[in-house]
UniProtKB/Swiss-Prot annotation:
One Pfam family recorded for the sequence: Ribosomal_S8
GO molecular function (one): rRNA binding
Annotated HAMAP family: Ribosomal_uS8_B
Family assignment from sequence similarity: Belongs to the universal ribosomal protein uS8 family.
Gene source species: Bdellovibrio bacteriovorus (strain ATCC 15356 / DSM 50701 / NCIMB 9529 / HD100)
Entry protein name: Small ribosomal subunit protein uS8
One Gene Ontology term, aspect cellular component: ribonucleoprotein complex
Keyword annotations from UniProtKB, A to Z: Ribonucleoprotein, Ribosomal protein, RNA-binding, rRNA-binding
UniProt keyword rRNA-binding present: yes
Length: 129
């Protein structure tokens, strides 16, 4: 399993189990995706703690008033065996704007909305709502 899929799966499973936080190995890609999720309001926050190896990233999950997880569904689109690339005018709108897509561009990892505004295409990593 690739690291992005593992990251998304850990968040999905922790949300289903109603955990307050989830710990995982840190990486720059995971930190970039987590920052996008914080900016868009899907998770509360995250922090990276250094250890003797690569570091530990702790993600604090977000729930609504009824106790439901803020992320209803996460889909990994581009995988190591099947890469999916999109142009800036073909970035999908997820759930009529209620969700978001995560794109890896030449300027870094960003939301689909940011990539469209900057007219950047790239690899469509995931969609969520």
């Amino acid at each position: 399993m690739d690291t992005i899929s593992q990251f998304l799966t850990m968040i999905r499973n922790a949300g289903a189990a109603k955990h307050e936080k989830v710990d995982m190995p840190a990486s720059k890609v995971r930190a970039g995706i987590a920052q996008i999720l914080v900016n868009e309001g899907f998770i509360r926050s995250f922090k990276v703690a250094k250890d003797s190896k690569q570091g530990i990233m702790r993600v604090y999950l977000k729930y609504d008033e009824a106790g439901g997880h803020a992320i209803n569904n996460i889909d990994r689109v581009s995988r190591p065996g099947r890469r999916v690339y999109v142009k800036s005018d073909k970035i999908p709108t997820v759930r009529s704007g209620m969700g978001m897509s995560i794109i890896s561009t030449s300027k870094g990892i960003m939301s689909g909305k940011q990539a469209t505004e900057q007219k950047l295409g790239g690899e469509l990593l995931a969609t969520l709502w």
